[in-house]
Amino acid sequence: NNTIILDLSTTLADETINFANQLNKKTGASWIDAPVSGGPDKALEGNLAIMVGGDEEVVEYVKPILEEISSKFTYFGETGSGQIVKMINQIIVLNNYAILAEAASFAQAWNIDANKIPEALCDGHAGSNLLNDLFPRIVNRDFAPKGYASQILKDLQMVSKLANAKNTPTPMSSLTKQLFTILLNSSQEKLDGTSIVCLLYTSDA
């Protein structure tokens, strides 16, 4: 069977491994886990970052497809490794929602014009794509859904499960998971992750 399934979704690594093994055993098909990062805008531009796991020869065969939809893809090894790296990506990205919300709340408390922060810090160590993208939306309370809070919580729950499997402490992710749980329990709306700042503002001043 020459069938190749290229999975760009984010799933638990152990589930990916089990499914890929069963699929190959029953049908002979190959499974490549290739979760992506970059968001809707990068997807439209074909500039996603892709983390790849699976048989190296099969990955080489689908390389033209990966190159077409990404600015960069990186092969990490056996099936499931792409999903593990995606969780590393999520640890960095999703905790930044809470960190940037805290920074915005701190700026507000001291009457600092937070809209100037991304440009002010762009050439320092704090400068990042996340600061440029998320911080203005947090400051201006632009909560139009781009990264749903419910999806963020789901991914943080996945991080927790994988960390527990290896007895790896993830205190930052655990706290961020608690914050998003509180946020989602407080509203029935489809909230963007940037609305996490609503838990931190002490007033509307």
Short names for language-model regions:
Residues 2-4, 10-90, 94:
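Rossmann-fold dinucleotide-binding core
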Residues 81-199:
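Helical "substrate-binding/catalytic lid" subdomain
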Residues 201-205:
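Conserved small/polar residues in nucleotide/adenosyl-binding loops
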